[in-house]
Structure formats: C-alpha cells, structure tokens
A protein has these predicted regions:
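Short hydrophobic "strand-cap" motifs at the C-terminus of beta-strands
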Residues: 16-20, 46-47, 65, 92, ...
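Conserved donor-binding/catalytic core segment of Leloir-type glycosyltransferases
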Residues: 8-26, 35, 43-46
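A charged, aromatic-enriched C-terminal amphipathic alpha-helix characteristic of glycosyltransferases
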Residues: 148-176
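Acidic, amphipathic alpha-helical patches
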Residues: 31, 70-73, 101, 136, ...
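Acidic anion/phosphate-binding donor-loop and adjacent secondary structure
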Residues: 1-12, 54-55, 179
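Nucleotide-sugar-dependent
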Residues: 71, 75-76, 83-106, 113-123
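Nucleotide-activated donor-binding/catalytic signature segment of Leloir-type glycosyltransferases, i.e.
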Residues: 13, 47, 52-77
Length: 179
C-alpha cells in the first residue's frame, strides 16, 4: 500500500505532476502559462535539477519538490491527478522516448504530453497530445473531468502491453518461431 508523502500531501488538488530530470527539455513557458491560466490547479515537478540553479516558474501554484528516491515515486504518483510530459519540441526532444510514459500508465493515471514523436507513435491512443498551452489546458481539463470515457481501462491495457514481462514474452515467441 502506497502512502502519499508529507511534502505533497498538503498541496491543493488537482495536482498535475511530472517526475524525471528537470532540465532544458522541460517547457517552462508552457508550465508558466498553465499555472497562470489555471491558478486553481497545482503543478508539481519532482527530479534533479540538471544544469540549472532553480526552476524558472515562480507562481504560487507551481511546486518544485526536488529529487526523490526512485522507490518513492509510486507514492508521489498516487497524489497526481494528471501526469505531465511537458517537453519543449526541439532537436533535443525529437528523438527521446520517455520511459516515464509506461511508468505513468502503470500507475493508471491520465497523461498529457507535448507532441513527442515516440509518444505519438506508441501511445496516442491513451496519452492526450497538446501542441499549445491552450490545448494543454483543454486536454488536462478533459482528463480531470473524466470526459474520456473508458480511458482508465485503455490505460491499464496499454500498460500491460508495455511491461517488461509482456515484451519478454513476445520476444520469446518470436525467437521460438525462428526455429
């Protein structure tokens, strides 16, 4: 049983959360615009700061909680209402394949992402894709209002097909078919 950590427990929901490296790949302008447009939402980032002293967003509803132990992330994920993948679209991000996508989905949480090619190719059936701050807000509102129908069922099904056990089983089948 996971318990919500103290440093996130008192943050006002809904909580839009991200965990991972906090670096130049994060679209801080997008996050600032989301925080400004929706002061009733809380945006939470977890992870090590990479090549920066502090996060550039200074809003009362923006919370940087620092680096956390990997084993504690499920406890934080439990507090998230929507998971974020707010990456800048640039040469740095065109070829990334964020491992957090299946991690978020394994937690059964809705995800909103900027248009990362690998996320679109592999997860657009369960991840909301948004190119602008307005779209990001709209997709997040849809996730929060549960206007997405059977999304939770589809998230679980997708997470199962992206687990290491499932992938290993599929690879074993392919190898067996070669013989």
């Amino acid at each position: 049983e996971t318990s919500i950590p103290d440093d996130i427990k008192n943050i006002k929901p809904p909580i839009l959360g991200y965990f991972g490296a906090v670096d130049e790949r994060i679209d801080f302008k997008l996050l600032d615009e989301v925080c400004a447009a929706r002061p009733d939402w809380s945006v939470v980032l977890l992870g090590p700061l990479v090549q920066m002293e502090k996060t550039p967003v200074e809003r009362p509803n923006f919370h940087y909680l620092g680096k956390k132990n990997y084993g504690d992330l499920p406890n934080y994920l439990k507090a998230f209402d929507v998971c974020l993948m707010p990456f800048v679209i640039s040469d740095l991000t065109l070829h990334i394949s964020p491992t957090k996508t299946p991690e978020y989905l394994a937690g059964g949480k809705p995800v909103v992402s900027t248009p990362i090619p690998d996320v679109i190719a592999d997860y657009s059936d369960v991840v909301a894709i948004a190119s602008t701050s307005e779209e990001f807000i709209q997709k997040t509102e849809e996730c929060l209002s549960d206007k997405i129908g059977d999304l939770h069922i589809r998230i679980r099904q997708k997470a199962e097909t992206k687990s290491w056990d499932y992938i290993a089983g599929e690879m074993k089948k392919m190898i067996m078919n070669l013989e």
